[in-house]
Amino acid sequence: MLLNVKACLVYTAPQECDALLQVEPTTDGGQRCDNPRLLLLSGSTLRLVEGEESIGMRRWITVSNRLDCIFEAQVDVRRVAANLDELQETPRYQLPSAVLQYLMTSRYCQSDLFLDFTASQFAGLSGGALVRSMSDWVKSNFTYDIFTSNPGTTATDSFSSLRGVCRDYAHVLIALVRAMGIPARFVSAYAPGVRPQDFHAVVEVFLDGDWHLVDPTGMATPSDIVRVCVGRDAADASFLTSYGALNLQEQSVQVERVST
């Protein structure tokens, strides 16, 4: 699937600060990013560094008074979705060392607090069938609400309210999956079916020796998800992280299908 991606961000800064910007899609086995163009109308690039797991690129920028940037690219997504129900768990002793961190509790995904719930709610399930059932549970029981959460909202907060945005859906699913001993990580992404259009967040689970995308909101599928970066949770994979105050003035995302 060929997609056009465009993101515009405008922030003001009360005083000069550094920020990490990560809006550029990665090129990997499942997608190719063509003709990427990042225009910094204000703010300047200091250095490019790799993202987590060497996936994607982060851009250190300095913001004096204002950050004003536009990113555009065309992305060819060639990913073929696996049938989750057919995927088996990789024995934990066989997991690659880089994957082990995604079994652990993290800042926004306190998986240890979900042990009792997952053991009772999803008894008898394993592997991909377990992950699919968990994703379906989140989608069925949560209400998508852009006014409920904030940057500090955790998986336990969202689980209590049963409301949130894609970030919150992803955090809850990650916590549930990790609680049952399956590695799961946060993925920042773009997707054409997101409503309202915005930056998106989904989940990758490690099954049968590889990572597989899952979207608990149901707004995207592996065949139309544009991966940007990954991490333990949103703390590792934010589109913009500032080391100083930044005030949002304007932000927009457009993802359009060009061809299938």
Positions of predicted regions on the chain:
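Short, surface-exposed, polar/charged, turn-prone segments marking secondary-structure boundaries
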Residues: C33-L41, R47-G51, R66-D68, S97-Y102, ...
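Short intrinsically disordered coil segments
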Residues: E24-T26, D85-Q94, T217-T221, Y243-A245
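Short low-complexity stretches enriched in small and charged residues
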Residues: Q22-R32, Q88-P91, D157-R163, R167-A170, ...
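Secondary-structure boundary elements
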Residues: A13, V75-R79, Y93-G164, V172, ...
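Generic structural "secondary-structure junction" signal
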Residues: T62-V63, V77, Y144-I146, S161, ...
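Intrinsically disordered, low-complexity N-terminal segments that are enriched in acidic
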Residues: M1-L84
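Short, surface-exposed linear segments at secondary-structure transitions and domain or protein termini
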Residues: Q31, S44-L46, Y93-L95, T221-V230
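Hydrophobic/aromatic-rich core segments of domains that either
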Residues: D136, D168-A245, Q249-S252
